[in-house]
Design a protein with these regions (language model features):
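Residues on the lipid-exposed face of transmembrane beta-strands in outer-membrane beta-barrel proteins
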Residues: 3-9, 19-21, 58-64, 78-82, ...
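Outer membrane beta-barrel transmembrane domains
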Residues: 105-118, 129-131, 156-179
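Conserved catalytic residues of ABC-type ATPase nucleotide-binding domains
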Residues: 1-15, 22-28, 32-33
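Extracellular/periplasm-exposed beta-strand and loop segments of Gram-negative cell-envelope proteins
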Residues: 24-54, 85-98, 102-115, 151-156
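Long, positively charged binding patches that form subdomain-scale interaction surfaces
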Residues: 11-15, 42, 48, 55-67, ...
Length: 179
């Protein structure tokens, strides 16, 4: 869930920014989890990490619109995002010795990691006008961190489809009609 604002200029380019609230759940292998060295004195034989994180994502993107028709258009965009980690909950599966039984321990952090402009994104999408002021947008995306994310500095790539409604402000519509 979230909110964004954008502006299309010269009927081809767009600049957008947003604020999204997301839950990131993942499982990481010991080789993918890059915690500080002191961590491994507590979990010397890490088996896996299950994570459940609440993240605020703040993307800034530049887009190019092509194939514009009266009621629809296609676009491609590139973005840089900041991730603000609000809550990180980790469930560690580990052994105290190489032959020991697997044990579990949960640990949570709050407001501890901020990754400013450290996630690169690419997307493409389709925008369809519903009315003069409202459009529906479907936008498949791929996001890749430049550095690891969270306490374990995990390369948390993500992909999905963002569905959104775009509303053109009434004041902008009045200016367009006067031209």
């Amino acid at each position: 869930t979230g909110i964004g604002i954008g502006y299309i200029f010269r009927d081809r380019f767009s600049l957008r920014a947003g604020f999204y609230n997301a839950d990131k759940k993942y499982t990481a292998s010991p080789s993918a989890y890059n915690a500080p060295a002191s961590f491994y004195s507590y979990y010397p034989y890490l088996v896996k990490v299950d994570a459940d994180c609440r993240v605020y994502e703040i993307p800034v993107s530049l887009g190019y619109h092509f194939g514009a028709r009266k009621n629809h258009s296609w676009f491609a965009s590139a973005s840089l995002s900041s991730y603000l980690m609000k809550r990180e909950t980790y469930n560690y599966s580990y052994k105290t010795s190489a032959w020991g039984t697997v044990q579990q321990r949960e640990w949570s952090l709050y407001n501890s990691n901020q990754h400013l402009f450290s996630v690169i994104g690419i997307s493409g999408g389709y925008q369809r006008k519903i009315t003069n002021r409202i459009s529906f947008i479907a936008e498949p995306y791929l996001r890749m961190p430049v550095n690891g994310v969270g306490y374990g500095k995990v390369k948390l790539n993500s992909a999905g489809v963002l569905f959104s409604l775009a509303v053109e402000p009434a004041a902008f519509m009045l200016r367009k009609q006067k031209k």
